[in-house]
């Protein structure tokens, strides 16, 4: 939840305080499925002759399914070299085809690709993988377009989102009671670490063939569990189609202005130096601002601007939340530290780091979209993470200006307007909100008029600002203290605002209470479309853990439903672009409620209409009909910064 909400600064302390989720699988996993065959390498084969591949192809065609797993020189699918391919169509029997090892026994890579192309592109044979999007990109770069893909990672995610992570090692332990051969065992660590291409073939065979074997076993289990849990539709409708769509978005990448980022780094460096001077002027001595220990000594011992506060480990408390509390009380020093941290992060994480992500071949940045990283179904991104670029500050907005359209093209931003508020109105059956959305009223002004008990025509900017904070705060389970800090009022006033809000919109309070009650009983919540988000700590004895999980449970159906709407929109748009043969217009990025497209300038008007039509039509889909309309804000520009 912290990661999804972009509360990244709290993530480390939350894990430290409460630990990682326990490893547990879906309830029907071991009770209703046959005992698995013992896992060993007895029938794992190393292919050292091109002709041997034929019988594996035949076996796959007869089975109608085959696990495909690639081994590579790196985890970057856009630059990695192919080292080998493993195949498995029968539990306990798998092979490994080495094509890029430093060994004379390797088979010619091009010959292997040519041999496997027919099978791997055959739509009548299922291609099963664990995070198969990675393998899709690797093989696509080698001239193979995988078809009919299945993904055990996504199957696990649909079944157990929020219960555990979904990487193969963990899934094997949970569902198969088997500890896999680790990647570290193959390549080592530290100074002794080698590339996978240097691993001995027999060892590589056991590792790669086991991966394929494990994947097939997991696939068989998850397929049955999806049926037992009645979750097949979530997997088939919302997960599988996104594999290829996101893969092509990643392959396309986005152009960034390297020189502009360089100038930003210079600008940020000057800001950092200026802030440091102001900090040292107050502290009356220089110190390492990045050191929590040294910073704590200044705050608590030298300046004495707060009573001594320490973490559980006994160190000085200098987290963002602590500094925000002190800044809220009027202290200048912690505010300067927060500003210094923000500018330093922008420089280190974005303006300095983004150029390092430019692919030397494509000259573009290729993020990785993560389908199974959140509890709610919301997408995430990494390497680089393009979903957490700050937008509230001017400096954060400047980072977005570095993302540009290529020559003779424009960027189009399509952003769902207040989608989570619309979904809340739909979920909780809030009559006043649904009416306001249907009449295209300003929802924040309406809320202000209700909670401040004034005519909507008399609502001023301050009223609206506070109402907006309450509206969005409710979605994320904001506390009265959190609201007080956000809108700069007393705790008492914040409590009164919340009480007034629930009095005017009682359906929302009913929704919140009933959602928590259901989650306490079942351990999960459902979104509008039926996806489950599990919350293991909803009944925890620790108040802080329980309270945090309750807020997350309230938010999950809202955020999850919004994510599903976005997934459906992406699927529709991909089909529409394909049907109309608009290959020159590309879907580049998905940033929460926003899609970014790169389109030819000549197609601007046509594409705006096409995008808007498809995204708004999701409101009346075969899977759910919303009682509130979905609206989309469209912006066009030469760079991402111009779109906001």
Residue ranges: model-predicted function:
Residues 67, 124-132, 411-413:
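Acidic beta-strand-to-loop metal/phosphate-binding motif
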Residues 75-76, 85, 133-144, 155-159, ...:
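Short active-site loop/helix that positions an aromatic residue
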Residues 145-161, 168, 175, 440-444:
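Conserved beta-strand -> loop -> alpha-helix junction used to position metal-binding or nucleic-acid-contacting
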Residues 1-100, 147, 163, 171, ...:
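Conserved "right-hand" nucleotidyltransferase catalytic core of DNA-directed polymerases
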Residues 274-277, 281-335, 503-555, 598, ...:
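C-terminal polymerase-core module
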Residues 90-127:
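Nucleic-acid-processing active sites and adjacent nucleic-acid-binding tracks
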Residues 407, 418-457:
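Basic, low-complexity segments
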Residues 194-197, 244, 251, 359, ...:
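Conserved catalytic core of nucleic-acid polymerases
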